[in-house]
Amino acid sequence: MIRLLTGLPLLAFLSACATPAPAPQPAPAPAMVIISEEDVKVDEPPPHGRIGMSTAWRISDAVPVRAFEFRKRALHPGSAIGIHPINHDEIYYVLSGEGVVHSDGEEQTLTAGMAAYLYTGAQVGIRQTGPEPLVLIIAYPPGG
């Protein structure tokens, strides 16, 4: 015997059939990732203008699942990360050396132990000054 579904039973049946499959879930993050600087070290011109030379340690690039970027960079004498717009907040933290940070036309000197918190929408950059390389940590959300 064939029974036709009509009304609410038909609507319930069609709704159940039309429910999309759940989206695939990303792989779970591991308990931790340990990264050696030497494994992520690259000598290259700095970003945003390629002014001079630098050493970059793209620490967070070695992490499979991440919520922010964490990089160490040494700007060699005379080099700079050129002025560029940012679409996220960003932090420059100086480990050693001296530099001048730029944000929307304002400039400030940074030395070891100082940080610049830079806001979304700003035009930012930093240049090395002084006799030693400017070594800094740069942190920001991914995709920036």
Q: Language-model segments: what does each one mean?
A:
Residues 69-86:
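Conserved short histidine dyad/triad with adjacent acidic residue
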Residues 5-16:
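Bacterial N-terminal signal peptides
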Residues 65, 120-144:
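Ligand-binding loop in jelly-roll beta-barrel domains
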Residues 106-121:
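Short acidic-glycine-tyrosine-enriched beta hairpin
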Residues 87-99, 104:
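Glycine- and acidic-residue-biased ligand/ion/polar-headgroup-sensing regions
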Residues 18-67:
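A short, N-terminal "cap"/entry segment at the start of jelly-roll beta-barrel domains
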Residues 59-60, 80, 104:
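Compact, glycine-rich, soluble single-domain proteins
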